[in-house]
Amino acid sequence: MRNYLTGKERLLVALLAFILPFSFAKAEVKEDGKTGQQGWYVGVEGGMPFGFSTFSSFGHDKTRLGWAAGLYGGYRFNSIFSAELSAKYGEMNLSAQDCCVERNYWLGSDGMLYNAGVLGMDSWEYANLKSHVRMGWYGARVNINLLGLFHQTANSRWDLAVSPHIYAVTTKADIQTISDDAKVMKGSTNWHLGYGADLQVGYQLTSYLKLGIYSGLTRLTGERMDGMPEYLHKNNFLWESGIRLGINLPFTNNK
């Protein structure tokens, strides 16, 4: 099997491997005798993903909003570090970009790109097609609360976190006509390594409930997420923004 890890991807894996041990460090006791909250938590999250591949969520005809929802659970080690596992499912619709429509590209039933319709073969103009993508994310992230680095904000109800993540991502793309959603090509399930980072802002509503928003990028290795031939466009990534609702479990320790 071809090795999809580039130098940048290896660097991200090494960075996570470097950061994770620090996440297990015991919270330091501050001068006022307080420490950051420690303990287990779970939550739900939902967002709107946008896909960028040969086709794009920002297509030639309109912008198409995707949706995603999932569960997460993790452990907060101190006021700076937490780590979590998550699972999420979502769907998107992507269509051709302006440049591909202007060049009058066609997709043949053999999955290849053509500059015109092909005699004796079913083929479709890019301008008339969209890719319906179903996705699953399964992975881990480390949250680094930047406000926890400063004494004045370490125990604030607010947090501002940078969250590197690594996912195993599944995609399955069916090619459909825009006009009537007729399926012209059925896709197969592909597995990808997904890597990237989120920026999160959260607020502790009560001792148990936390509300947050997030936005981040995830790059995918391997096959095109949209099931289209790779030509000109090298992009293969997601941009997702959404909300999170977390619950501190009863056996969380507040020190």
Language-model segments: residues:
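Bacterial Sec-dependent N-terminal signal peptides
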Residues: 1-32, 36, 142
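Outer-membrane beta-barrel biogenesis signature
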Residues: 14, 24-43, 151-160, 250-255
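Short glycine/proline- and aromatic-enriched beta-strand/turn motifs that initiate or cap beta-hairpins
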Residues: 26-74, 171-173
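Gram-negative (and chloroplast) outer-membrane scaffold detector with strong preference
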Residues: 28-29, 77-178, 249
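Outer-envelope beta-barrel architecture signal
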Residues: 34-42, 79-81, 136-138, 154-162, ...
